[in-house]
Amino acid sequence: MSLHGSGLEPMELFSSMKYSIKTGSPSKISSDCVVALVWNKGTLSDEAKAIDSASNKAISKIIRSGDFSGKLGETQLIHNPAGVTAKRVLLLGGGERRKLDGKNAGKLLQAGLKAAMKSKAASVHFATSSIEVSGRDGAWFAGRLAQEAEVCSYKYNETKSKKPPAITTRTISVAPSSGSRRKSVELSLKRGMITGKGVNRARQLGNLPGNICTPSYLAAQATDLGKKHGSLTVKVLTEKQMARLGMGSLLSVSAGSIEEAKLIVIEHKGAKVASKPHVLVGKGVTFDTGGISLKPGGGMDEMKFDMCGAASVMGTMAAIAEMKLPVNIVGIIAAAENMPGSKATKPGDIVTSMSGKTIEVLNTDAEGRLVLCDALTYAERYKPRSVIDIATLTGAAVATFGSHVNAMLSNDDALAKSLLECGEESLDRAWQLPLWDDYQSLLNSNFADIANIGGPRA
């Protein structure tokens, strides 16, 4: 189904949340809901103390009752507390104060925002000026708040005839720490909002069904981004253009589908032309049946998520352009649909990649590496400073780590270390696996330069 045939407009993301800075006593703040932190074992933050004093010890009474203890992410709503201007006070557990790092700050903000939004408060104020996050300043905390607010406000309803009720919360304010500069906090709020919307863009693309989110749909979304942001240049390669470049590996995946493959290139030029870019490459298999090596029927509907690497690249490029970051970044999306059909690639077929290497396709369900290898070869023309590819690979990674950790392989330990640290803080953790030459012989083929699978020992 095409973009226009789907009945869906190009994405305009997503919430209409507004963010601001408010100062003053938390007991006097005009808001539908004021959020105050309580540390583990009921130790009150400065803001909670102020509210407790104004409300005739309302918070202390709840803690003494045993209903709330301040564990990380714990919440307790107080309606119409006496002596407080806000209609509601939300107690938010901060856990161990000395352990409040970026990761735990993200967790408590998620919990607080979900509880505040569930209360149907239209305006929410985070009274957090005394809160210190290890290794971070007050501006960082405000930015993370805006990011988590956008993510928490997301709901998928594009293909439902009856739309669920919209999130009531529309304005979020924060009291920054006393040492924070107002302009820094405002900039951080804006960047946090943009980051959250980038995450939601990726989630929305992933959630759309495969008959709507096709390679052509992804290309249309990228083109719309290019029209919206002057820093972006978007180029979409057709199958004929890819064939002229020798991308036989990528094209072998789409051979059985009526949906044309697309190579989508999004360039953000935020630095000097001479500055080498970083390159992001995303696997965009918009639906993966496995091809002739057909997957089992159970759970196949979830194979619409096989383009989430591409969705991540799209969301990241949108955020980079919105922030006007002073770097050069190239996003490359290899988009294809993997279907069985009379023209589909068969096990044992040999294809030639853009690099000139021949590949024996022993399993058509190992298609991600086939689309990515040509995209990675294409990326070489940019002489990049770094290349990061993002892909839903493989089932073995899920068997190894479950749903809690991403598998990561890298030939650059410094880059890997940076990505691992970012993953810990963003709650999107990864674990580095070995990338040793010892494994190369497992891909030997009797008939081609390389096989696309390494067998049960790989």
Feature-to-residue mapping (PLM):
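A generic structural signal for tightly packed, nonpolar segments enriched in small/aliphatic residues
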Residues: 67-69, 218-458
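Short amphipathic alpha-helical segment within the helicase RecA-like ATPase core
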Residues: 12-284
